Amino acid sequence: MNVRPATNEDTNDIFWLLMEMAKENTSREVSVSGTVDEIRRVTGMGGCIVAEKDATIVASAGISPQSPWFTDEVFLGDSWFYVHPDHRVSDAAAKMKKSLQQFAKNAGKDLVLAVHSTDNAERKNKFFARDMELM
């Protein structure tokens, strides 16, 4: 599994991956333009990564500066963190998390990753909490 920074050329593949994520997590209509804009925004900031297997993007994560309403502190938080179901037994998630941790460390920011679905939420929380500070 190869994890690398995303480029604008990856936008289409990331978009379709996020459509899979949306199918799993919401019944709401997904905004095509909003999704593409978010992918491009995060990619342009250098905060989007992809995991590839055999030259196919099978996972992606996007982080950007965020701040909760209760503090002025800025951290790097995820807009998405998704591994295609066919690749969830791979090391894609672990490699992406490690890559994002290094990105945040280099930026001098804390990294906050959230669980965006209720499916297997406890397992996902444990994965994100492992070797990361919880907020």
What spans do the regions from the language model cover?
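Conserved beta-strand in the GNAT
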Residues: 50, 56-65
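Short amphipathic alpha-helix that is part of the acyltransferase structural core
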Residues: 1-30
